[in-house]
Amino acid sequence: MKTNGLFKMWGLFLVLIALVFSACSDSHKEKKDALEVIKQRGVLKVGVFSDKPPFGSVDSKGKYQGYDVVIAKRMALDLLGDENKIEFIPVEASARVEFLKANKVDIIMANFTHTKEREKVVDFAKPYMKVALGVISKDGVIKNIEELKDKELIVNKGTTADFYFTKNYPNIKLLKFEQNTETFLALLNNKATALAHDNTLLLAWAKQHHEFKLGITSLGDKDVIAPAIKKGNPKLLEWLNNEMDSLISSDFLKEAYQETLAPVYGDEIKPEEIIFE
């Protein structure tokens, strides 16, 4: 009886040891930097917008197009040797952080504005674009914040515009939507008086909807847009920072601008107003 008891205890001990080693092994796997994971996988997973031309959208053939997309494909080329070794994953503004935390994407390239609040939850690489908030309305009737009193303002959930007006102007009623298509459709259908978003996007949209104008072209701080990754991946962050330096010094950002943004903005906007040189 005693012998059987000893065998049982010894068996239990071995099981516990196996569990400990398994846990240690899993912990080691979890600590592997995202850069190593991407190289082993052979595919770069990038979160982009699917409804925000000319930065990230899907064309009639189901292909992703836009400024963010072109830069992301160059990242895949420089990291994995082939710009096609990339998987674009559509993401809404309010889900960008969660997609990183859940490892659904390696990098967010969805017009993500670098803010102090977001720094607490994700790591930003060096920026590739300049941006500020703008407000668009029919005929540009809204020319200052005071004119929004007792009126509704459209914003996208989880965007800089959402945070800015919620924090600084809590008395302005916000009409919030997840998707950019919903946001602009609401403005076209007169669901609210005006819409607040990145001025770069509003300028592009106004080019196709001439009855709408930016009455407020720049609001609040001038910000930057940068690639974002999940915290705790220093090797990937270092690689991204070096990559951004390279894309700027080689004039690749200028080339991407000419390919995707210049046809939209024309001569009204100078490249240096938007991109880093």
Task: Name these PLM-found stretches.
Residues 95, 112-120, 164-167, 181, ...:
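A ligand-binding cleft/hinge motif common to bilobed small-molecule-binding domains
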Residues 26-29, 39, 163-177, 213-218, ...:
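Ligand-binding clefts/hinges and TM-proximal coupling segments of bilobed small-molecule sensing domains
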Residues 20-23:
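C-terminal motif of bacterial Sec signal peptides marking the signal peptidase cleavage site
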Residues 25-29, 70, 74-78, 151, ...:
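Extended ligand-binding regions for polar small-molecule ligands
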Residues 29-109:
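Extracytoplasmic small-molecule ligand-binding "clamshell" domains
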Residues 50, 129-139, 199, 203-245, ...:
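Periplasmic-binding protein-like
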Residues 31-33, 86-98, 140, 175-185, ...:
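Short helix-initiation/N-cap motifs at beta->coil->alpha
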Residues 73, 77, 85-147, 214, ...:
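Acidic, polar ligand-binding/catalytic clefts
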